[in-house]
């Protein structure tokens, strides 16, 4: 009996010892299948553009490939929730932004995911400022003049957005709240129809991402009043920041980056962060991001988490104080 039991233990020990190299080998082989990046917006927008720029380059390192999967619905809620509930194995990532990880936290009382608890930042790749543009015949030379008129004439000035709860809506509503003025909100189904009416003179002002706004400003069809970043935009060097106008101590930049579901193993997180930093800082990727009007960031791990927490602390209370609603 003792001999049999001893033989059994020896065999079991040999089996376990033999399994260890296989486990190490499996870890070293990560990734051994394609990684998918969930984009919670349709193709063609900022989410999709940045996700594909990074995926194209990262896929050259991770030979099974990096595949972008657009999962839309309820703004950015459906795709983001899907990523939060995905297996935490390093094979599903989220294209995260201020929109789905910060602004949604202030907009929705019962958000189905927690931006901090449900995700681990891989890295932030780029940020874009917003530009406040006005119809070219609006009789104000700067933002301070517009605000002074709006104070004396409540709801006489109108502002467009790309929809209720969009980044354009929240930034504008927060600005008017801090400035103590009332403007009439005109929500559209996307930015393009907002531009059509703005250029046509049927609405007065509109906040949009600076790269898109620049096209219309450079064409002379609209004029720029302010940018939302911490510093002036290289695309509009003569246009002041919101802080510089003296109207409100407000700033917002829309950053984009990759996030993994919480509890993703440390080994996979470290590999992803190491390779993503190399991708973001590669000359060709930086060139593509800068030509699209972005400011490359290359903030990984705790650096990215600090930005997320900072913006949550800034914007969630402000959205609630301003009474901004998603509908």
Predicted region positions:
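Hinge/capping helix and adjacent helix->loop/strand transition within the periplasmic-binding protein
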Residues: 85-91, 106-193, 242, 255-288
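Short coil/turn segments
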Residues: 42-44, 98-99, 127, 135-140, ...
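N-terminal export leaders
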Residues: 5-12
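N-terminal (or domain-start) structured segment
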Residues: 26-117, 155-156, 164, 181-204, ...
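An extracytoplasmic/periplasmic, membrane-proximal ligand-sensing/linker region
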Residues: 32-34, 177, 244, 266-327
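Short beta-strand->loop
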Residues: 114-124, 160, 182-186, 204-205, ...
